[in-house]
Amino acid sequence: MARLLFITSNRIGDAVLSTGALEAARALVPGAGVTIACGPLAAPLFRAEPSLERIVVMEKDKLAGHWVALWRDLIGHSYDLAIDLRGSATSYFLPVKKRIVFRSGKAGGHKLDELAALMGSDAPLEMKIHLDPRARRDAKAFAGADKKLLLIGAGANWIGKTWPRENFAALAKRLTKPGAPLTDARIVVLGGPDEGGVLDPLAEDLQK
């Protein structure tokens, strides 16, 4: 059986964006068993991937030790295709028939455009997350009786990636006003435990 190695992000948002590249990679090696390497936060996103052989969770280590650990974990396997969205040298030290390694483009370019170019697509790649029964149950329990939800992930791992909270608030109100696509939707602000400084003021803005 063919095998696909997909190295993606530590961060949830970037990992979601990368799912389009994963779908494009599948088309290059149909039916391949898939190994995904990513950070612990992103790992649950991929647990229901079709033909998944395993998820290798990369725990960040000093002096790039996590890359050495990843190489040691993978060295006993060969791959027909390796996609490395982290731009590391890992795949060059593995038995790989073909590799596609991300190199950062011009400053200011959107990640989706960069990923599309990497995979040879003229249009942004459609993102897709496969859900297992547990995820569907959790989503149903979270949504409750609400038929429409607007989820906002306003945080980021550094200030250069953040969008002004005023913009999030204005967009949310525009999408949920009478006659809009998400009229009367429940607005949910999502984030990690260290993002309260961004998310709490946004939640207050949305209640005004």
Predicted regions, residues:
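Catalytic machinery of carbohydrate-active enzymes
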Residues: 1-208
